[in-house]
A protein has these predicted regions:
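Short, surface-exposed beta-strand/beta-hairpin micro-motifs centered on an aromatic residue
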Residues: 91-93, 229-232, 315, 319-329, ...
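Extended active-site neighborhood of metal-dependent phosphoesterases/phosphodiesterases
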Residues: 341-348, 353-367, 441-542, 572-587, ...
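C-terminal regulatory/interaction regions
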Residues: 704-842
């Protein structure tokens, strides 16, 4: 329908009869009469400014409707007489009780328009149909007319862009055109009273609305020498930075596929489109220079600028229109973003956030990869749950659940989901800190990463995952190759994201040295040069005073504040510390040790800067405690080798401030300590492992230390497992305040009568070495009571004012059953029936 957009409508009124109807009150309704309005084309002279443009012409088509507007703004539709279809003039019929006092008219009429004081509210569609050598005017082209001297003069309120598109050969199935900061479609207004009417779109409130030409049924063939031509209706005006984007492939009949190539054109100067004219625009579509990976980051239709995009080596940011590009060899087979503050992403299978996309083409073949963000609102206040060492093992070969691991993990998932539900107005996220699986059980129980992913899908929140040493395939010798399963199900092994004012980084600090068998499994602590290079690029985008949370599996520092390992590993640890030297607020979270300890403000010598650098690191303990073993003895006492309970850390963030607490699974949120009546503790092999042979007995007794001896000194031992700077402990015996002595690193006796008993209370079968021996806790305290029967009240307060008060009645029994009741007994969960899909196993 290419014809000129100017009309003269001369009013010809013809009266026809209609049937009668009654009003609600019974009175006859006025008879409707049919009136006819004729239209005549007005030619507009060309001017020098339009010499490079073509005259825009339109012929009426069957079914066209116009809107007739009276002085009160009432709108009446009029339909084209079929006999005038294809003509430059036409007759339109409308029905009314009497002839309308026509003031204005407009095209097209859809029934949704409103008019006030000559201002018409209407819409220019975003999606336009393609017509060979032209455009489809219906519901796209906008015209306005004024009544004068017995007729209506229509003038065009829009322009048409004639896109002559060249580029890499392809059959186009979609063309998009847009301009940053301006709407090219959508709701707008048309001043019918103006001598030069213009359709004006509304202000941009979120994303600039563009126009899309759908070519699905009529694909245009584009080559580097032969232009494909398409026409797009646009509001008249001048546009800076106009963008044209095409999508297509070499398959003439194909639909959307992985072979699609998206090409982009950006105008470097202002382009003017005059009303009533066809403006040619010669467009050469190109890929970003040298790009093998490119795309766009959007939130709905809104482009998001400044988003970091990486392939694990290269790191770029999106421009003002959300575009990015990089020359990538696609080393990781994926591209991923650092989620910007205020946004989140879809929660994928296994509760894994979908911030990454896999590449599908060869390294030298360009491909487009887009990312979709979700507006997450104000994240200034949010909560991060940090979960270490889950170690799911599945079922043993006899069909029994190994250490009740799935049942106990289900309890953890249920608890976290309840926490999310109880705080539904809060922003809550989670990070694992490695070892969600156990590589040995990949072989023994055929329980691998995809099985864990299937089960962790029960989490009702996004869970960002960190690599642990047991998440590597021990049957593969090389560090990169042994992470294939991880990359397949979790994406990148190192990445960053932003929530509120905090920058989060997940690092793979396990350098695998496997020999390809269980017996030759080995690893170092540190970052590869590739990760260190990426980390520096990531940090270059972060302000020096931004709070940074670093998640990694192996701790930087051990329980004594020294570096975790020695030799070459020490140097790699120092390189991690050095990368964050210029940043004032860095907190590290780690796991791996299956113990709970904190190094707060620990001064570590930076060998690169030759200056001491304060380190704040929280080793969060293990969700599985002692690999879920103690929970098989008493389901209400899941205890690690240092005596800390199985659980996870809760970090509440407000702006740049953080409050942290350790949450024991199944216990009260303010369960901070355990108190022992030393008079009741006397651990002997005869009492606790009567079935043990001499080798097991000797191994058991090797770790008992002072607890092998009875005591009557009236001491009360207090294990505060999350103690660090800012905690406080107060003990009263009646009105008397007792002196608290810090014993420092010390053994917790409860573990010795829990899993140690299970491991050692068996007959000898040759020599025996205990693999799950007790470890020191970081802070054991004690007070001396006045007698063996005097009770005490212990108050422990964390740095944020949360209090745990326990009244200890003495003598207190020392047993697993006694301490299982501490902190409130957990809800009795029904064991889940995890039916693992065998096809998910690799």
């Amino acid at each position: 329908m290419l014809k000129r957009l100017s009309y003269i409508l001369a009013a010809l009124l013809v009266l026809c009869g209609c049937s009668k109807e009654n009003n609600e009150n019974g009175a006859p309704k006025p008879e409707l009469q049919t009136f006819t309005v004729a239209a005549v084309i007005e030619r507009v002279q060309d001017v020098r400014a339009n010499l490079d443009e073509a005259t825009l012409e339109v012929l009426w088509q069957k079914g066209d409707r116009i809107g007739l507007v009276d002085a009160k703004g009432n709108i009446t539709p009029a339909l084209l007489d079929d006999e005038d279809a294809g003509s430059a003039s036409g007759r339109f019929e409308y029905q009314a009780a009497s002839a309308i006092d026509i003031v204005y008219a407009y095209y097209p009429y859809t029934g949704s328009e409103t008019c006030t004081s000559g201002k018409l509210s209407m819409s220019l569609p975003k999606v336009q149909a393609h017509a060979s050598e032209g455009f489809v005017a219906a519901n796209t082209l906008i015209m306005a007319g004024k009544y004068s001297d017995g007729g209506l003069t229509f003038r065009n309120a829009c322009s048409v862009a004639q896109l002559n598109i060249k580029g890499q050969e392809s059959y186009l199935r979609k063309i998009q055109i847009r301009c940053p900061g301006l709407n090219l479609s959508g709701e707008g207004t048309l001043d019918l009273s103006s001598d030069n009417p213009r359709f004006i779109t509304g202000e941009v409130t979120d994303a600039s609305a563009g126009v899309e030409v759908n070519l699905a049924s009529d694909r245009l063939h584009m080559t580097s020498s032969e232009a494909a031509t398409a026409y797009v209706v646009l509001p008249a005006g001048s546009y800076n930075g106009l963008i044209v984007e095409t999508l297509g492939n070499t398959d003439k009949t194909g639909t959307a596929s992985d072979s699609d190539v998206s090409l982009i054109y950006k105008s470097s100067k202002s382009v003017t489109f005059n009303a009533g004219r066809v403006r040619p625009l010669n467009v050469t579509m190109t890929l970003p220079q040298n790009a093998t990976v490119y795309g766009r980051v959007l939130c709905g239709e809104k482009p998001v600028s400044g988003v970091a995009v990486t392939d694990g080596g290269n790191l770029v940011t999106t421009d003002t229109d959300g575009y990015y590009s990089m020359s990538s060899a696609k080393p990781h087979g994926m591209v991923y973003i650092s989620i910007p503050s205020g946004y989140t992403v879809r929660r994928g299978y296994g509760s894994v956030p979908e911030f990454y996309r896999y590449t599908v083409k060869e390294a030298t073949v360009p491909e487009r990869i887009d990312f979709e963000l979700i507006d997450d609102g104000d994240q200034t206040n949010h909560t991060m749950l940090l979960i270490g060492d889950i170690h799911l093992m599945g079922y043993n070969s006899n069909g029994n659940e190994a250490n009740r691991n799935l049942t106990q993990f289900n309890a953890l998932v249920n608890e976290i989901n309840r926490y999310v539900a109880d705080n539904e107005d809060s922003k809550i996220y989670a990070m694992t800190l490695g070892d969600m699986t156990w590589d040995s059980y990949w072989i023994w129980n055929n329980f691998r990463i995809p099985d864990y992913v299937q089960i962790s899908d029960k989490f009702n929140l996004n869970v960002f995952c960190t690599v642990g040493n047991h998440d590597n395939d021990l049957t593969v010798a090389e560090d990169w190759a042994c992470m294939a399963d991880w990359r397949r199900y979790y994406g990148p092994t190192y990445y960053s994201f932003n929530i509120g004012q905090v920058h989060y980084i997940s690092l793979d600090n396990v350098i695998t040295k496997n020999g390809g068998t269980i017996e030759t499994r080995d690893y170092n602590c540190g970052l590869t040069d590739q990760i260190l290079t990426w980390l520096k690029k990531d940090l270059a985008l972060v302000d020096k005073d931004t709070p940074i949370v670093v998640a990694m599996h192996i701790p930087l520092l051990n329980i004594s504040g020294g570096t975790s390992m020695s030799g070459d590993n020490d140097m790699k640890t120092y390189k991690i510390i050095d990368a964050f030297f210029d940043y004032s607020d860095v907190t590290y979270f780690s796991a791996h040790s299956h113990t709970l300890y904190n190094n707060y403000g620990e001064e570590v010598l930076n060998l690169n800067k030759f200056r001491y650098q304060p380190i704040n690191e929280h080793n969060v303990g293990a969700a599985c405690a002692d690999f879920w073993a103690s929970g098989t003895i008493n389901k209400d006492l899941l205890i690690s080798r240092d005596g800390s309970p199985g659980g996870y850390r809760i970090m509440k963030v407000s702006g740049k401030s953080r409050q942290m607490t350790f949450k024991a699974t199944g216990k009260d949120k303010n369960y901070f300590f355990r108190a022992y009546d030393r008079n009741s503790i006397h651990i002997t092999a005869e009492k606790y492992i009567p079935k043990a042979g001499p080798n097991h007995k000797a191994e058991y007794e090797r770790y008992l230390e002072e607890y092998a001896d009875a005591s009557s000194d009236n001491y009360i031992y207090i294990h505060v497992w999350d103690w660090y700077e800012g905690w406080n402990i107060s003990v009263k015996e009646g009105s008397k305040t007792l002196t608290v002595e810090d014993l420092g690193k010390y053994k917790d006796p409860l573990y010795m009568i829990s899993n140690m008993v299970r491991k050692c209370n068996v007959a000898d079968n040759g020599s025996y070495t205990l693999d799950m021996f007790p470890l020191n806790c970081q802070h054991m305290f004690r007070v001396k009571a006045s007698s063996a029967t005097s009770s005490v009240t212990i108050t422990v307060t964390d740095p944020f004012g949360n209090i745990d008060v326990q009244e200890i009645k003495r003598p207190r029994v020392f047993s697993v059953e006694e301490y299982a009741a501490d902190g409130g007994v957990r809800t009795k969960y029904v064991a889940p029936s995890f039916e693992l899909d065998p096809e998910m196993n690799l």
